[in-house]
Amino acid sequence: MNAIGNFLVGTPVFTIFICLALGYLLGKLKIGSFTLGATVGVLIVALLIGQLGVFPRDTLLGDIFFDFFMFAIGYRVGPSFISSMKKFGAKIVYATLIFLVSAFIVAYACFKMFHIGPGIAAGIIAGGLTQSAVIGSSLETISKLPISDHLKTLYSNQIPIVYTLTYVFGTIGVLIFLRDIMPKLMHIDLKKQAVKTAKELDMIPVPVIVASTHFYTINDGSSLIGQTLGTVNTKFAKGLVAAGLNDSADMASVINAGDVLAISGGIDEIGRAVQEFNLLEVTGKTKAYVSKQVVLKKNFSADVLKNAQDKGVLVATLAGDVMDPAQFSTLKPAESVTLVGQKDAVSEVQSQLGRLRAAENIINYSWFALGIALSAALGIVGTKVSGVPIALGGGTASLIVGLVQSIYRDKHAHMDTIPDSLLEFFQSIGLNLFIATVGLSAAKTFISAIQSMGISVLLIGAVISILPHIITFVICYYLMKMEPISIIGAQTGADTLSAALNDVSERVGSDASPFFAAAVAPAYAIGNIFLTLMGPIFIVLLS
């Protein structure tokens, strides 16, 4: 056993990544509808493996990946934060702040009443309020406290252990309250209420008929023979354009039997035109026709849309749904459209409308690196509380910078971005690699810490998990008269409870899940920032 322990301590790269591998597997295990999740799985594995030796924590490695994690959260939630605020207004923010203030007051009262120390308090906030980022921000604050190294080690080791103990009720207990108990208290059917409100707010997804270009041979006897391409364009139904003839977009071209006509539009409209004008589809594609996404440089009138269609260019939404003139004229600068048609004609129209939108799958490495660099600089900004310096911290700064950068990029979509798949990777691996380093270093004190803390930590954690939700529900529903699903969404986001987001989204169904996610988004961003700061604040107040 000593040989295994020595090997694990001596090869930290192997140890950390075996914790990740086994932790992700453990996190997938289901108990009923509950899954531990990757973070708890990695922490449990790290605490178990950590019993085999003394593992010093690599703070630089952990901090870098923790910053990656927080930056990814901010970047992913940025655009939805703004759109959700526009739809729901200030009430979601009020509900979020009510929850956060309630959580702080309840937690502070419990900590004082039961004489809870700084490390245990931060662990309860992290686990009971399901905000694992508190672990990183609290460890950073502990390192700056004017206390002995022994106490710093004690507090640092207590945090991940208490997090593990309180996380289960913080997830399951609160999930049951939000998903099952609150709807009954409000006398609603979760799915029916969500669909009803989503319809009222025009947030039910509408099936999109994607515009594309298809090619057809002009048969003998077709009524289009002898007409110009421009004339045919005027005869087509709304939502269709004659994009080109024999790969040319010259609207003066005369149509003859055997020519190949390109038609852009929705497949249903194209099908009706094929029947009406006696056309035969040609298989295969040609490089002469393209689809390009364009970022508008200013407001345009409906006449601009008509001019584009007169040139054989179809204008559609980003999703590919054909736009009508009224819809086009309401678009604002920095919004995007899709142009479909012959490449020369599309290029001409694109130059009038704005810049090409950058592809979403191209990684802007400079943008990402700049974000992390700015986060490190912003993270040192802070103040002193009771003589102890409290900085924003690299993690919280990363979340804020990610949020700002994503909103900026959303307004300047010609810039390359950071693909969501990469952000998802950083969000998951960044947090869990950090958690693995923390768990390994704290493992040796795990058993003794549980024995010394007893059942009281679980009970205090349960109170801090659930009581702020009850207070927020009473105020928002009975006093503020908020819409029920918005209340559940705000409390889910404020508590950064991903399990509730996933579970309630499934319960309300695919039609209403975008509405519920939109209610969660602004609260989630605010909750991430303030809960992450709450741990360090309690560290200072209780030291």
UniProtKB/Swiss-Prot annotation:
- InterPro entries documented for this protein: AAE_transporter, Asp_Ala_antiprt, YidE_YbjL
* Keywords attached to this entry: Antiport, Cell membrane, Membrane, Plasmid, Transmembrane, Transmembrane helix, Transport
Which subcellular locations apply to this protein? Cell membrane
Q: According to its UniProt record, which protein family does this protein belong to?
A: Belongs to the AAE transporter (TC 2.A.81) family.
Q: What does this protein do?
A: Catalyzes the electrogenic exchange of aspartate with alanine.
Indicate yes or no for the key word rRNA-binding.
no
- From the record, give the transmembrane residue ranges: 4-26, 33-55, 88-110, 117-139, 159-178, 362-381, 385-407, 428-450, 455-477, 520-542
In which domain of life is the source organism classified? Bacteria
Gene that codes for this? aspT
Instruction: List the GO terms this entry assigns under cellular component, sorted alphabetically.
Output: plasma membrane
- Pfam families to which the protein is assigned, alphabetical: Asp-Al_Ex
Q: List the membrane topology term(s).
A: Multi-pass membrane protein
Q: Origin organism of this chain?
A: Tetragenococcus halophilus
Keyword Transcription recorded: no
Q: Name one GO molecular function term.
A: identical protein binding
Protein name listed in UniProt: Aspartate/alanine antiporter
